[in-house]
Amino acid sequence: MATKEQLYNPAIESMLRFFHAVTPLSPEAMAAMSCCLYQEKYPRRHLLHQQHRVAAHLYIVSKGLLRSYHHHQGKEVTIALGMENSVLCAMDSLLSHQPSYYSIETVEESEVISIAYNDLELLYNEFHEVERLGRLMISRYYLEQEAALRSLRFQTAEERYQDLLMNNPALLQRTPLGYLASYLGITPATLSRIRAKWGGSDRYHSGI
């Protein structure tokens, strides 16, 4: 049972307005969703989900920055980065109910809204508009992942950096150099050279 504080949490109310802007939601659907959304504040590098465990939640960034990553041969490979209003989750595990290939953690101090996938499925069954919202949000998530994969396969490192510089400059400034290099599929040294060429600076979060 949600508490009064949860029902009237400003961050959750703001997130519900964002959802309503994505697709119209009835007052009944918004009230039901508010009972299933939980907000927490986390410090930098707080682990939300660990690789090899079965995922149970979706995470929506209210404030801050999250990343999804995979441990491979002793290294962390950053798969996705998410700022405000982004959704991060171990979708492979949520859909298959098998252990996940990915971990999710905060990159900076963050406010995160979570919803249990089981609760979301119950909302899908009860409210058609919530099912549509979920479909739209998951489609957006997959399109972002597909764009990132396509970029890695068909663009040079410099072209990938240029895309971020044009479309998401805040992500460049807020993401530590090592995470950003991993996300772009290059070494930190290569990223430093590219940033220097394009007038960037590594004074922003130069360390992990």
Give short role names for the model-derived ranges.
Residues 77-135:
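Cyclic-nucleotide recognition modules
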